[in-house]
């Protein structure tokens, strides 16, 4: 049997099938494109659906690939089994209506056993087949396989509901009796017993029938065009061909594990405890590839999967004694292992490292407290003799410390404890109920949830109206329903209303309510949604309001129009962010007020000034195109087929509103918008900032507020121009540049004077030479204005033979700066400063000849200087 690297196995696979007339299909992105049914690409055939369903006809009906894939349905098993991974490579060969069973089996056997190819021992190969599939049995016999190596298995039939289906034949490699401690032998295969002896290395699916759940399998009709779909795990083949005990001991994982050994100072022992090494090695592969393919850690969907993987790996790093961020340092190793076929990991190394490191640092800020709490909880359980971690405690870990529930469960189970899932769900629901209640109780509503929950009278929002005549159906005041009210504050429900209730980031309308005589009887100061969906108008009562009477409702037209401008501009901003920053920049929150708009979005670094300028310009270009804004109501499926952007976390009914701004922006939105982008007038970004892990915020203004913002900047510029005595604004940059040149010249002159002063002071410092164990050293506290002056001292010290070692300390702006320089081969400056720095509550490091450190305890400077002699 050949000893092949994983790269050689992959290439040999592709070369073999290419020699059989197959086209090599490149590995697709892990993030599915135009396939909402998949979270990740999870198999080799997943990217070829377009061929098998007939929507696209391949140029060549014979296809081969090596496809990266992610499956995360049972993450907790990673590291506990020999072959389970979250990311893996599936080698495949496919026939779309071309060759079938005979060629698939014959060529497969040739690839596995031919000396020219994999050269696996024939006596080590076993095949399972569907009992009624005599054709596959006979074909294996024709290839020379012994009947005793062909095992009929009833489950060897692939089908998922109605549609293409067929028998499959699986190929296993026998690793020998050492992996069969109970000497069960071939029954391991016959009875489908989980084992490490017979390893499945390949599955050939013969898509032959059209499955019909209404009839017995024996009555399935044959497909007019039969297909072949196969999958062989690269990791498993590598383990077999490299003689590895598990997949983790192959060249796909061991370089990563070796790096983890260096970081942890612990050795990986295949016969000992290896779980944490395996988990980290597996998860960093998934993280590196997924982030490289555009997925980012977050709180939902793919992002949550990545965040969960990262946090699980970090926790296992801590088990190995690694407390600092370390996963990002493994990214280059992952890239180097896979470079021959997947160069993109190294190409995107900086970006991937940045994302991983930032996530690690964010998690580290809460993990210590959470770990301590979990340890304490488990210790208390042991003392009390209980075996279940309570749901309220799991929720506190989740809510306060950011511990994923799955991670808490895993760590608890490792210690032999169960967790209370139902209790956790109850605690989560309580929090959600409190959050909903706080929205109802807060602001101007001031009512208990029970009162509002009992309102069942219907209320319709009139999108196109700004005034309406409507019947008053509910009055709530002082925590109770009333038939009438004539003063104070109240909540009103009308059968119909033009008032928009705050929702989707758009603030509520304000306005007035008048009686039949035209007298204003109430002013609307807020509108919120009641628990049953009605619009609750919070009003300041100025006259009598009576249930059952009709009133004229009129919104503040100016306020509504200003809010609409900002809301439509928000849609333009969202589209511009996609175009300029990337599709990962999706909405994480928004607020559309009358004075400004605020937009939160997912992104892992500050948007650059150049990007902000481009975004601003693009939004304004769309405004000045005077594009009509159209709104239609349709069903959710039609909306999605239009390409409408649905915001994650928003709940949509069967009917939705789609807001389109030409071809530039299409979003699902229940808010109100201008009829034409020209109404917005102008758009200006005021500020961009970070507000949390992976979330940025843009504050912007439109229309009159944008003009005022530009005028404010112009006024400030004119003031600067007057100060600089620049007759025209365009001369200000030159004037500022001239001032900067003068400043730099003065700074340079000042630095020269400092150097001279330091040189003069150095003369006294360098005279104070002491000796300890044959090492001449200078240890002194100096008065300097910055750390750079310490380096100046060191540079002068190097010019003459004053001593072997120089140690300087300075108290600069409430901090301690320490420098160590060495000319002695026996004294490493970096090592020496690591010993001295903690004395002043600091840390540092450096090279053998020069090292720096910072600290905070100025009172201990003399202790540090006194300790120098003890180090020689």
UniProtKB/Swiss-Prot annotation:
Q: How is the cofactor bound?
A: Binds 1 zinc ion per subunit.
Give the reactions, separated by semicolons, that this protein catalyses.
tRNA(Ala) + L-alanine + ATP = L-alanyl-tRNA(Ala) + AMP + diphosphate
Q: Where is Zn(2+) bound in this sequence?
A: 567, 571, 669, 673
Protein biosynthesis recorded as keyword: yes
Cofactor dependency: Zn(2+)
The subcellular localization recorded is: Cytoplasm
What EC number(s) does the entry state? 6.1.1.7
Q: What class of enzyme is it?
A: ligase
Which GO molecular function, any one, fits this protein according to its record?
Answer: aminoacyl-tRNA deacylase activity
Offer one Pfam family short name for this entry: DHHA1
State the NCBIfam families in the record: alaS (TIGR00344)
Q: State the similarity comment.
A: Belongs to the class-II aminoacyl-tRNA synthetase family.
UniProt note: domains: Consists of three domains; the N-terminal catalytic domain, the editing domain and the C-terminal C-Ala domain. The editing domain removes incorrectly charged amino acids, while the C-Ala domain, along with tRNA(Ala), serves as a bridge to cooperatively bring together the editing and aminoacylation centers thus stimulating deacylation of misacylated tRNAs.
Protein name per Swiss-Prot or TrEMBL: Alanine--tRNA ligase
Organism per entry: Streptococcus thermophilus (strain ATCC BAA-250 / LMG 18311)
Gene (UniProt): alaS
């Amino acid at each position: 049997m050949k000893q092949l690297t994983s790269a050689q196995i992959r290439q040999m696979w592709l070369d073999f099938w290419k020699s059989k007339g197959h086209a090599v299909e490149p590995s697709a992105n892990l993030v599915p494109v135009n396939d909402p049914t998949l979270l990740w690409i999870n198999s080799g055939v997943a990217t070829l659906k377009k061929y098998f369903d007939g929507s696209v006809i391949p140029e060549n009906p014979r296809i081969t690939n090596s496809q990266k894939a992610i499956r995360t349905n049972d993450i907790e098993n990673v590291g506990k089994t020999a072959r389970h991974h979250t990311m893996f490579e599936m080698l495949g060969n496919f026939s779309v209506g071309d060759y079938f069973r005979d060629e698939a089996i014959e060529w497969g056997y040739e690839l596995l056993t031919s000396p020219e190819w994999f050269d696996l021992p024939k006596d080590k190969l076993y095949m399972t087949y569907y009992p009624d599939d005599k054709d596959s049995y006979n074909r294996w016999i024709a290839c020379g396989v012994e009947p005793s190596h062909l095992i009929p298995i009833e489950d060897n039939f692939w089908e998922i509901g109605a549609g293409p289906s067929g028998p499959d034949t699986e190929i296993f490699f026998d690793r020998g009796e050492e992996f069969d401690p109970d000497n069960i032998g071939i029954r391991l295969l016959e009875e489908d017993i989980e084992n490490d002896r017979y390893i499945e290395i390949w599955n050939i699916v013969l898509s032959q029938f059209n499955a019909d759940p209404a009839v017995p399998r024996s009555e399935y009709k044959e497909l007019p065009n039969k297909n072949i779909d196969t999958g062989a795990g690269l990791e498993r083949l590598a383990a077999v061909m490299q003689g590895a005990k598990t997949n983790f001991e192959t060249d796909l994982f061991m370089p990563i594990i070796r790096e983890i050994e260096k970081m942890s100072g612990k050795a990986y022992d295949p016969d000992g405890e290896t779980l944490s090494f395996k988990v980290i090695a597996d998860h960093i592969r998934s993280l590196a590839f997924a982030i490289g393919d555009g997925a980012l850690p977050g709180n939902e969907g793919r992002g949550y999967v990545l965040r969960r993987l990262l946090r699980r790996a970090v926790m296992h790093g801590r088990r190995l004694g690694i407390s600092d961020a370390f996963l990002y340092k493994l990214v280059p190793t992952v890239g180097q292992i896979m470079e021959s076929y997947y160069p993109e990991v190294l190409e995107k190394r900086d970006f991937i490292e940045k994302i991983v490191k930032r996530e690690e640092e964010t998690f580290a800020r809460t993990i210590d407290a959470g770990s301590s709490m979990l340890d304490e909880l488990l210790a208390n359980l042991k003392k009390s003799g209980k075996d279940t971690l309570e749901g309220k405690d799991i929720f506190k870990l989740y809510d306060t410390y950011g511990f994923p529930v799955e991670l808490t469960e895993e760590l608890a189970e490792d210690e032999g404890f169960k967790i209370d899932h139902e209790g956790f769900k109850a605690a989560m629901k309580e929090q959600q109920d409190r959050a909903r209640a706080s929205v109802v109780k807060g602001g101007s509503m001031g009512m208990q949830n029970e009162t509002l929950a009992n309102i069942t009278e219907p209320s319709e929002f009139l999108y196109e109206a700004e005034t309406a005549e409507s019947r008053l159906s509910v009055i709530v005041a002082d925590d109770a329903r009333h038939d009438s009210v004539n003063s104070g504050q109240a909540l009103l429900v009308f059968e119909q209303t033009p008032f928009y209730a705050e929702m989707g980031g758009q603030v509520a309308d304000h306005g007035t309510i008048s009686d039949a005589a035209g007298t204003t009887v109430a002013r609307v100061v807020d509108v919120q949604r009641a628990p049953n969906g009605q619009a609750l108008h919070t009003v300041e009562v100025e006259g009598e309001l009576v249930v059952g009477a009709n009133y004229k409702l009129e919104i503040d037209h100016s306020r509504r129009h200003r809010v609409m401008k900002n809301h439509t501009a928000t849609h333009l901003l969202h589209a511009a962010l996609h175009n300029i920053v990337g599709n990962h920049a999706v909405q994480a929150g928004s607020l559309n007020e009358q004075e400004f708009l605020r937009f939160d979005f997912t992104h892992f670094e500050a948007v650059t000034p150049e990007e902000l300028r481009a975004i601003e310009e693009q939004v304004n270009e769309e405004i000045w195109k005077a594009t009509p804004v159209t709104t239609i109501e349709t069903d959710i499926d039609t909306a999605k087929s239009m390409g409408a952007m649905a915001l994650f976390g928003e709940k949509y009914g069967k009917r939705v509103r789609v807001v389109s701004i030409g071809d530039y922006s299409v979003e699902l939105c229940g808010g109100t918008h201008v009829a034409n982008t020209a109404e917005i007038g102008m758009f200006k970004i005021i500020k961009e900032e970070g507000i949390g892990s992976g979330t940025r915020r843009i504050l912007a203004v439109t229309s009159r507020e944008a003009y005022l913002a530009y005028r404010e900047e112009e006024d400030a510029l004119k003031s600067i121009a007057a100060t600089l005595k620049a007759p025209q604004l365009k001369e200000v940059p030159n004037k500022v540049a001239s001032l900067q040149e003068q400043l730099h010249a003065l700074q340079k002159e000042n630095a020269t004077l400092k150097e001279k002063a330091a040189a003069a002071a150095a003369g006294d410092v360098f005279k104070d030479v002491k000796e300890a164990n044959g090492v001449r050293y200078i240890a002194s506290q100096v008065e300097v204005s910055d750390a750079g002056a310490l380096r100046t001292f060191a540079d002068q010290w190097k010019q003459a033979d004053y001593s072997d070692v120089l140690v300087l300390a300075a108290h600069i702006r409430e901090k301690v700066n320490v420098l160590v320089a060495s000319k002695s081969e026996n004294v490493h400056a970096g090592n020496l400063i690591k010993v001295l720095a903690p004395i002043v509550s600091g840390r540092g490091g450096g090279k053998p000849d020069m090292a720096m450190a910072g600290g905070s305890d100025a009172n201990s400077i003399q202790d540090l200087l006194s300790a120098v002699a003890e180090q020689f």
